[in-house]
Amino acid sequence: MAIQLTRRGALSLLLFLTPAVMPTWYAGSGYYPDESYNEVYAEEVPQTPILDYKVPRWCYTLNIQDGEATCYSPRGGNYHSSLGTRCELSCDRGFRLIGRRSVQCLPSRRWSGTAYCRQMRCHALPFITSGTYTCTNGVLLDSRCDYSCSSGYHLEGDRSRICMEDGRWSGGEPVCVDIDPPKIRCPHSREKMAEPEKLTARVYWDPPVVKDSADGTITRLTLRGPEPGSHFPEGEHVIRYTAYDRAYNRASCKFIVKVQVRRCPTLKPPLHGYLTCTSAGDNYGATCEYHCDGGYERQGTSSRVCQSSRQWSGSPPVCVPMKINVNVNSAAGLLDQFYEKRRLLIISAPDPSNRYYKMQISMLQQSTCGLDLRHVTIIELVGQPPQEVGRIREHQLSANIIEELRQFQHLTRSYFNMVLIDKQGIDRERYMEPVTPEEIFTFIDDYLLSNEELIQRREQRDICD
């Protein structure tokens, strides 16, 4: 039938149509014909190009950026990309080759491998504490980084590091060390006068001004000496402060506190007397009281005060022998003369021949020094009226005064009796028999002496020996 095609006719039609559906193929380009899903064609094996060693550009010309290709062709000369050519690849300084170091132009019109040059870099340097660095070319090859430290710090280690070809930095990482001591300024030295009646002065001051030249941190401030607001005794006192920073660097400063005491000339005790003074006895505000020994009384001011002008107030008194006035109207008037001045030992006996009386008077006459030292005056009441005698030393008492004394002190005429009266007029001890002066002195020393008298007794312990 006319509509049927023979097998031979059908094959001829397919061969005729094939060139119309095949795209252009560029030998050595590396590309292959595209397939079209809209067309159907007979599958064929690609044609193998004919090898020709004479073609000068069998493979594409090698061009490696930031590098160089050194090629050796079997043809020699200028054949750098002919079939069989072998090229050695290298990079410029500062670049590293990534890929094949050697490639060859293959029959497939391709090179046997790929490679490229990558710029060499070192890792970014870490920042150092209390310091910094500057680099000439960042992290690239041959870049030099110079280190520096903040004010107050010293660089220890490599001052510069260079980026080397192996991607490492030369040297080691330095450190910034705080070597500068803190700055410290103490307050000015000062001088102060002691207060009245005191030998010390309270002194205040502001704390020192301290600053660290590095990070500004002061870890410790120590004081050698009294604290501000303390009481300072007379003289010069050195106050020292020491400051420490974090690196244990230290700095010190000092100033002087001087305390002065206004003093008056040293007073001398009066003849037959002594002084008792407050405080140091010669400093501003001190008060000195004048006292007279037993048997003497003071004439003049009782005390003097050291003034701010460094002079004593008033004039010095004197101690004169005590005058006893027996021409008084009563026993009370007689005793008032001894109030706070003398102690009284009143002896009563029936008659001058009384054995106890004679024994007691004999012992007391041998101890007049001890009696005067303890401010003791003896009053004798001896005999019976109208021949009764009363006397104080050489002074005779009237009969009226004798009677009042007996009644006031409860002294009988019937037998020997004796009473010891203190400086306040109080009956302190009674005796019915003679006693030794040592017993009387012991009682007075143990119970009747004032603090001032105790001090004087210690100073005059051997005066009667």
Curated annotation (Swiss-Prot):
It holds the Pfam family DUF4174. Residues 1-23 form the signal peptide. Forms homooligomers. Interacts with PLAUR (via the UPAR/Ly6 domains), ADAMTS4 and CTSB. Interacts with HGF; the interaction increases the mitogenic activity of HGF. One of its GO terms (biological process) is angiogenesis. One of its GO terms (cellular component) is cell surface. GO terms for molecular function: hepatocyte growth factor binding; identical protein binding; signaling receptor binding. It comes from the Eukaryota. Residues 177-261 form the HYR domain. PROSITE patterns: HYR, SUSHI. InterPro entries: DUF4174, HYR_dom, SRPX-like, Sushi/SCR/CCP_sf, Sushi_SCR_CCP_dom. The gene is SRPX2. It is found in: Secreted; Cytoplasm; Cell surface; Synapse. Keywords: Angiogenesis, Cell adhesion, Cytoplasm, Disulfide bond, Glycoprotein, Proteoglycan, Repeat, Secreted, Signal, Sushi, Synapse. Residues 69-119, 120-178, 262-321 form the Sushi domain. It comes from Bos taurus. Contains chondroitin sulfate chains. Disulfide bonds join C71-C105, C91-C117, C122-C163, C149-C176, C264-C306, C292-C319. Acts as a ligand for the urokinase plasminogen activator surface receptor. Plays a role in angiogenesis by inducing endothelial cell migration and the formation of vascular network (cords). Involved in cellular migration and adhesion. Increases the phosphorylation levels of FAK. Interacts with and increases the mitogenic activity of HGF. Promotes synapse formation. The keyword Secreted applies. This is Sushi repeat-containing protein SRPX2. The keyword Signal applies.
